[in-house]
Amino acid sequence: MNQFDKKSQAWSALFSEPMSDLVKRYTSSVFFDKRLWQADIAGSLAHADMLAAQSIIAPADHAAIQYGMAQITREIEAGEFEWKLDLEDVHLNIEARLTQLVGDPGKRLHTGRSRNDQVATDVRLWLRGEIDLIGGLLTDLQKALVEIADKNVEVILPGFTHLQVAQPVSFGHHMLAYVEMFSRDAERMLEVRRRVNRLPLGAAALAGTSYPLDRERVATTLGMVDEQGQPQVCQNSLDAVSDRDFAIEFTAAASLAMVHISRFSEELILWMSQNFGFINIADRFTTGSSIMPQKKNPDVPELARGKTGRVVGHLMGLITLMKGQPLAYNKDNQEDKEPLFDTVDTLKDTLRIFAEMVGGITVKPEAMERAALRGYATATDLADYLTKKGLPFRDAHETVAHAVKAATTHQVDLSELPLAVLQEFNPSIEKDVYEVLSLRGSLNARNILGGTAPAQVRAQIARHRARLG
């Protein structure tokens, strides 16, 4: 008979030979899922509390489990806990150490529980905490954008469509566009959190358990409750242990947040380039070149743009991971953690650095205004002026196109064309047209809810400040 330590794995009594070292390395997750240790201990303590309340384990066993978990917490926090590859994952490592510390009570902890519902609970608990942190970071970034918007309400930026100069906008208004995007990202995170915050524990391996578990007690202990304080428990044991849609949904929300950061990054990269020259980014967020001494490279926005592809890739990976799995749990689901962990880390790091970087942006109003003038940004204002004089808008549009052509020929802005020249295109044009053709006049004219007029921008800034606190 081939002798080996059948206690090295929790499931090894059935087997006649040990797992190969290659398979151990291939199937082990402990060196990345150990970050779940706090959630694992919290879930185990709540489970033990319920087992004792239901008289499934004795009070002495409950006390021993609490003592052992407190000791394990101290060891992990002190960096003294020995994580073992042989024990596969965070769950068995902690359980083995608990049994080593307190004996049989540690063996009783797993009563009525499977690793299938245990890991699903741990990931949900961990992700809930991370979503709360991300919500705070999204708030910080929005506040930073509101501050730079407030300082630059009167600064005129050429607004673009198709990357062509379109109409003048307030730089503050432009910044607030991203505040709106990130506020929706925060809303999505809260919606995801509501679905993450449901308890799988008690589903056991896939079919539930014959023990009289009080799942709602565990949910309440772990804070898995709704807005009214009612416990939120997964209602189908098969679904509870097998689906990772909550991880996919979070990664989708994270991908959207990163896409918004990537769009902002693209603009910062363009605006910092010599071709635009609209802004400077503080030196601490840029790098130089090893060969070209004149270079100041926007590495942080470029990396954020690149990391967006990585996070979106994780979303596609998780969707593909789930698409072919039959019910219930399959080992495939071990592959959910690394992309989920990396998505969380990437999003948090990016939000932190962008909130700080926004505060280090220097705006160059003169360069922005020159660019707006070069692009005939007030052409639409002239068309609106003619429409208000009674000309159908399509005719006004054509008339202004001829005026722009004339200005281009003479290499001047529309506001620099003499009145007599403008009247050649339409005799109803009067001297007051120059108020319309100025960048400032164009900006002030958009005094409508959601518009770019400084008065509207200041109102939106006040609204966001009240919302963000």
Curated annotation (Swiss-Prot):
GO cellular component: cytosol
Keyword terms, alphabetized: Amino-acid biosynthesis, Arginine biosynthesis, Cytoplasm, Lyase
One MF annotation (Gene Ontology) recorded for this entry: argininosuccinate lyase activity
Principal EC category: lyase
EC number: 4.3.2.1
Matches recorded under Gene3D superfamilies: Fumarase/aspartase (C-terminal domain), Fumarase/aspartase (Central domain), Fumarase/aspartase (N-terminal domain)
Protein's name in the database: Argininosuccinate lyase
InterPro entries tied to this protein: Arg_succ_lyase_C, Argininosuccinate_lyase, Fumarase/histidase_N, Fumarate_lyase_CS, Fumarate_lyase_fam, Fumarate_lyase_N, L-Aspartase-like
Similarity remark: Belongs to the lyase 1 family. Argininosuccinate lyase subfamily.
Gene encoding the protein: argH
Annotated compartments: Cytoplasm
Pathway field: Amino-acid biosynthesis; L-arginine biosynthesis; L-arginine from L-ornithine and carbamoyl phosphate: step 3/3
